[in-house]
Amino acid sequence: MKNKYYPLRSSMDELSAKNDNEIDLEKGPLPEYNSEDGSTLPPYSENINLKDPKQMGANNPNLFNTDESTTPPDYGEDSLSITHRENHSSGTADNSSTSPLKKAFLSFISIFVLNVPAVCYLTYKDALFKDYGKDEWVYFAVWCASCLMIFISLWYFYETWIKAVKVTVIFLAQCIKVTVVFLAQCVKVTSISLAKCVKLTAVFLAQCVKVTAVFLAQCVKVISIGLFNIRREMMIIIWLLWLIICCILFGCVKSGDLNLNKALIYSTCTISAVLLLIVSSVCIPFWTFERTLAKLAKVFLLQSGIVLVLNGTMFLRGKHFEWTGCEIEASVLFIMGNVLFLCEMECPGALIRTRNSIRNGIAFILEGAGRAIRGANDNNDIPLGEMEVESEV
């Protein structure tokens, strides 16, 4: 015989408890009920004056409802065990939702992916099902049996290895994400560090260049002032010594005792240009450096013209000139530089006066030619009447 469990409280008790706990805002707080004298009615009781239970049930149809749906349930041992199993299994996932076909397909795909490298290797070696003997077929059978066992294991433990694969994939994704973020941070920090290093290096080099330029400018200024304040006789002595050295070098080269053609040419050109630069910047200090370079360029152009004229003249006369163009250039530069240096040292301001004289002479010639041309035009514009009057007079 089964033991049935019935609830201790009926619907009447629930209704009374509900009425006891509720307070009607329109009627006010609940009055105290005295059960001995019965003078005080139960709180808000509407059905207490009704002596007929049917009338009470009419007011509250759920009070004496004898429908089967309201009968107490059967709380036997079987029902309790079933309810316990349902509640226990409701918190876990239903593993039977995955179809067997899906399990088999995913398990086969896993085995296929694992066997692809072996098949590719055997195909590459041209050893797949080719010249198989007894041992090879035994190995192949073992391989097939192993694949079958692995397939069964994967199919049986589908949820476990799928969960492991998911966890592994998530872990690898997180590792890749962390690695990418770390590399990005490293690249960012490295780029910022390199930018700072480049900036500091550029600032340092700029400061070095600035300091070097200022130092060289100070050195040039001191040397220029010293050369400008030196005695003219000392400058002439230095020039004469240099001239003697150049003549000795020329004589040695032409006599064949010294083979320094290129070195002599380059040194002569360089030192002569330096002498001309010193003359231009020291003896004529109001020339700017740009104008000095322009004068040097004009000197080189003039020398080039002289070289071309000499070579052209020798070519037209049919004579062979032993000197090359570089030697002619060096000789002309040497002569012109030393002549200009000597003229400026003997007569300070001679170059400026020569330049101004040449410019004024050219201007005077052009002005005279212009006046002559205008005078001829004025004589041609005389009217005929004036010419007749002049003839009569």
Swiss-Prot record:
TM regions (residue ranges) = 104-124, 137-157, 167-187, 208-228, 233-253, 269-289, 296-316, 332-352
Superkingdom as given in the UniProt entry: Eukaryota
**Signal in keyword set:** no
Gene Ontology cellular-component terms for this entry are: ascus epiplasm; cytoplasm; endoplasmic reticulum membrane; Golgi apparatus; vacuolar membrane
Q: Where is the composition biased (Basic and acidic residues)?
A: 11-29
Keyword Protein biosynthesis among record annotations? no
Q: Which UniProt keywords apply?
A: Cytoplasm, Endoplasmic reticulum, Membrane, Toxin, Transmembrane, Transmembrane helix, Vacuole
Q: Where is this region: Disordered?
A: 1-98
Cite the record's Polar residues compositional bias ranges: 57-72, 89-98
The GO biological-process annotations, alphabetized, read as:
meiotic drive
Q: Which family does it belong to?
A: Belongs to the WTF family.
- Name the job this protein performs: Promotes unequal transmission of alleles from the parental zygote to progeny spores by acting as poison/antidote system where the poison and antidote proteins are produced from the same locus; the poison component is trans-acting and targets all spores within an ascus whereas the antidote component is spore-specific, leading to poisoning of all progeny that do not inherit the allele.
Q: How does it assemble?
A: Homomer. Forms protein aggregates. The two isoforms can interact with each other and with themselves. High sequence similarity is required for their interaction.
Q: What is this protein called?
A: Meiotic driver wtf19
Record organism: Schizosaccharomyces pombe (strain 972 / ATCC 24843) (Fission yeast)
Q: What is the lineage of its organism?
A: Eukaryota, Fungi, Dikarya, Ascomycota, Taphrinomycotina
